[in-house]
Amino acid sequence: MREHLFATVDLSQQAGHPLSCTYHILIKDITEPIQCESYGVRVTVNQTGERKELPDITVLPDAVLKLVQQLAEGGVTPCTLRSVVEDWLI
């Protein structure tokens, strides 16, 4: 699996203490039954190392790019990532 760093966002003002999150796009090559790429996301809290990743969300690169942009803009943390992505998928 490959990864692409999308953004690092400072959330200190919202949290009231030093806090920043890094947002990555995860890329997995799929060869069967057709050759394509599957995309997911990972969010990491830089101060603690807490992280959550959700692979295989979509095969559409534009969709995962839009998703990770919304995650970064919204300051989504690892503990809320699954819920936010589930709502995004609906």
Stretches with model-predicted labels:
Residues 1-23:
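Negatively charged, low-complexity tracts enriched in Asp/Glu with abundant Ser/Thr
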Residues 2, 18, 41-44, 48, ...:
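Residue-level signal for well-ordered alpha-helical segments
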Residues 10-12, 29, 45:
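A generic structural signal for solvent-exposed, polar alpha-helical segments
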Residues 12, 36, 70-71:
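Compositionally biased, low-complexity repeat tracts
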Residues 15-39:
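Amphipathic, interaction-prone secondary-structure segments
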Residues 31-53:
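A short, structured beta-strand/loop element
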Residues 50-90:
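Mixed-charge, Lys/Arg-enriched low-complexity segments
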